[in-house]
């Protein structure tokens, strides 16, 4: 595969021939894998298309909008039906007023837990922004955490290899008698593999056979949507009780301007939505202003394609950075469970240089230099390269990382894999 002709820009004009050849030679070697990714995208696109068709999505749904209470918004209600059908679960609620993946997860946890019950995290410490939701960081501030609410917390750490510790989980089920077992599929800011649907299914089986009666399995599914073809964590073939995620990641297709979802058991979805709005009103309230329904529906339709491009980007990032001698997870040849690629850079300067290179190659704010800082919800300084059309969208080309050892950068998204290819030219030059 030959590199494309150069064009004047702040980043490509400085790329050396060697940096270009490193990237495009890696892309050429990945061509057969990219073709397999395209076939997977086609199969998942068919599944989304069939869900739209079965629910008779029409122009009146796409063009519908609501204000005030939002009661009777046919577009919003049809969006929920499409998601429920697509993910093969009892209920799904997709809402613009879920502000983040963390917000969706918090709604699920507060809905499923009651004072005096126990939450068992089966994948170690929760993601940074969830620590203050649970109450493991910022305790005593009275901010309305699960801990403030009287929910006990316990965790089972992953193994040194980043796998679930099944023996310790079984012991934890017996010892803590949890009401909820929580699983985070993606790596977060940890240098470990993403967990598969097989891992989720195994946890569900373990909880059903060895856990206390009524124990529920909740899954943080951020970055996991539309990757594995068999379904999603809440699908009947896997069996989790509830999954939560963000529309400015995979299912929004880089078009949804905001929002998130909860999906799974009907009773748990209702309880989660009661935390989002109020008990009683639940899913019947919540306006979708202007073109919100169109943008979310269109993004959901495009999601298999944008995820497919992000998966190809993930493989290319891994191949290029492996070639430069860096540790990468997952390796370029490994199966993908999400589209996050973690690169262990080893020091602060390389982390900042990597993010600067990606920011320079972005369509938005290419002239801005990323600097580390304290971001609400995070305990450490974090640096972000996010020249995106939707603020904070990690379905678009982005990378970020905390300023702590091992100074890994976490790369996501890309509306087309060639966007990351051009950015990697700049990364290679800077490193």
Question: What are these model-predicted stretches?
Answer:
Residues 322-431:
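Conserved C-terminal alpha-helix-loop-beta "cap" of PLP-dependent enzymes
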Residues 14, 19-26, 33-47, 51-52, ...:
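Alpha/beta catalytic barrel-like cores
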Residues 98-99, 286-289, 337, 372-375:
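Short linear loop/turn motifs
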């Amino acid at each position: 595969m030959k590199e494309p002709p150069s064009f004047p820009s702040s980043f490509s004009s400085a790329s050396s021939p060697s940096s270009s050849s490193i990237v495009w030679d890696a892309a050429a070697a990945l061509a057969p894998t990219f073709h397999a990714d395209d076939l997977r995208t086609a199969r998942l696109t068919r599944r989304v298309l069939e869900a739209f068709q079965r629910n008779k999505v029409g122009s009146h749904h796409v063009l519908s909008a609501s204000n005030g209470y939002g009661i009777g918004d046919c577009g919003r209600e049809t969006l929920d039906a499409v998601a429920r059908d697509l993910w093969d679960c009892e209920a799904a609620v997709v809402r613009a007023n879920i502000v983040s993946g963390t917000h969706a997860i918090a709604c699920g946890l507060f809905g499923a837990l009651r004072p005096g019950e126990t939450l068992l995290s089966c994948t170690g410490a929760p993601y940074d922004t969830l620590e203050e939701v649970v109450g493991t960081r910022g305790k005593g501030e009275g901010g309305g955490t699960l801990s403030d609410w009287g929910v006990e917390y316990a965790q089972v750490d992953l193994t040194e290899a980043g796998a679930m510790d099944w023996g310790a989980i079984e012991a934890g089920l017996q010892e803590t008698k949890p009401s909820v077992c929580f699983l985070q599929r993606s790596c977060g800011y940890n240098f470990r593999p993403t967990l598969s649907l097989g891992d989720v299914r195994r946890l569900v089986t373990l909880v059903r056979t060895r856990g206390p009666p009524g124990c529920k399995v909740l899954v943080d599914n951020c970055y996991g949507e539309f990757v594995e073809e068999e379904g999603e964590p809440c699908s009947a073939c896997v069996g989790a009780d509830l999954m939560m995620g963000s529309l400015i990641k995979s299912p929004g297709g880089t078009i949804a301007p905001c929002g998130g979802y909860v999906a799974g058991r009907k009773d748990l979805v209702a309880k989660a939505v009661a935390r989002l709005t109020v008990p009683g009103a639940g899913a019947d309230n919540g306006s979708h202003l202007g073109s919100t329904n169109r943008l979310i529906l269109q993004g959901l339709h495009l999601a298999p394609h944008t995820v497919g491009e992000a998966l190809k980007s993930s493989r290319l990032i891994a191949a290029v950075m492996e070639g430069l001698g860096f540790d990468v997870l997952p390796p370029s040849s490994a199966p993908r469970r999400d589209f996050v690629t973690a690169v262990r850079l080893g020091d602060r300067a390389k982390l900042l240089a990597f993010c600067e290179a990606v920011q320079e190659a972005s369509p938005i704010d290419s002239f801005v230099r990323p600097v580390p800082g304290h971001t609400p919800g995070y305990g450490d300084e974090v640096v972000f390269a996010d020249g995106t059309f939707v603020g904070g969208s990690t379905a678009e080309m982005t990378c970020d990382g905390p300023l702590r050892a091992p100074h890994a950068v976490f790369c996501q998204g890309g509306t087309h894999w060639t966007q990351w290819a051009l950015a990697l030219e700049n990364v290679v030059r800077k490193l």
